[in-house]
C-alpha cells in the first residue's frame, strides 16, 4: 500500500514515518512537505537514515499516487486538504483536531479558528480504536483522537458505558511531557523555563475538553461539564491522567476492578493493572499501550482512575497506525508489537 504524509516534520509525523518504515503492508512512503522542500527527509532526521531516505513531492502529484494519507499538520491544514483528497478517492487519517468536534460552532469556540465544512466533519469517524472498531473498519476518513482524550476516555469508558458516572462530578487532572506542545520552539518549552518546573496551562480553556465531553455524552447521555486541568512536566514523552468521580450505584473495590478487567480483556493495547497497583509513564514509554489502575475509596465513595500513555504513540502516531490496520482488515497490532516500552 502506498502511503502519503503531510506534516512529517513534527514529532507526531516523525513517529508515523518511523513506525510505517517497517510496517509489513507499507509498500512505499511519500512525503508532502512545505518546509525544506527538495531535501532528503533523513537528512533532517538522522535516526531514520536508511529507513526513510525520502524526498518530498507536491500535493497535485502525491494525491494521485497514494492509497492513504496521514495528516499530522497543525489545526487548519486538514480542513483545507481533506476535501481535495476525498475528491481523489484517497483514504485519510487526520491527527489534528480539525475533524473531531462534530459541532462547528463548538470547534470554533475552543480552537479559535474556522471549522472544516460540516459535511467533512460529519463523515469523519472518531478513531478511538478500542471503542469504535466497527465504524473504523468501514471508514474512509478518520479523526484520530487527541492525546489527552485518548488517556482520559480509555480511563472512563468502562464506567460511562455502564452509565455509572456521577453526572455532576468528573474531575480530570492530567500531566504531559513537553513533546505534546509540538516541535516549534516557544518560551514555555524553553529548557530554562521547563527544567525543574511544573505548571498548569490553558486553565478552563483547553481544546481537548469538548472532545472528551462529546464522547462521554455519547456513552452516557446527560453528563454535565467535566473539570479538566492540563499540566506540563519536565519530561519529553508521556501522559498521566488521574480521574476522580463518584458512582451512580454501590460497587465494592473488587467489583470495580473486575469491571475494568472484563471491559478490556480483549483489548491488546489496554492493560489493566492488578488491584492495588498503578501505572507509571515510563512503563509505556515508546509504545502503543495504555495502562490503567483503578480503585475505590470506600471512605469517600469516590473512584480514582489512573491512565498512562505515550503521547506520541497511543496519543498520536501509534493509534493512527492501529486505525490504519483496522481500516484495512489487518490485525490491529500489525507493525506495532515490535515497539515495546523503553523503561530505562
Swiss-Prot record:
Annotated pathway: Amino-acid biosynthesis; L-arginine biosynthesis; N(2)-acetyl-L-ornithine from L-glutamate: step 3/4
Active site: 147
Record's GO cellular component terms: cytoplasm
Superkingdom of the source species: Bacteria
Enzyme Commission no: 1.2.1.38
A Pfam cross-reference name: Semialdhyde_dh
Cellular compartments annotated: Cytoplasm
Reaction(s) catalysed by this chain's protein: N-acetyl-L-glutamate 5-semialdehyde + phosphate + NADP(+) = N-acetyl-L-glutamyl 5-phosphate + NADPH + H(+)
SMART domains attached to this UniProt entry: Semialdhyde_dh
Keywords (A to Z) from UniProt: Amino-acid biosynthesis, Arginine biosynthesis, Cytoplasm, NADP, Oxidoreductase
Top EC class for this record: oxidoreductase
InterPro entries: AGPR_AS, AGPR_type-1, NAD(P)-bd_dom_sf, NAGSA_dehydrogenase, Semialdehyde_DH_NAD-bd
UniProt-listed GO biological process terms: L-arginine biosynthetic process
GO molecular function: N-acetyl-gamma-glutamyl-phosphate reductase activity; NAD binding; NADP+ binding
Family: Belongs to the NAGSA dehydrogenase family. Type 1 subfamily.
Role, per record: Catalyzes the NADPH-dependent reduction of N-acetyl-5-glutamyl phosphate to yield N-acetyl-L-glutamate 5-semialdehyde.
Protein name as it appears in the record: N-acetyl-gamma-glutamyl-phosphate reductase
Organism: Bacillus amyloliquefaciens
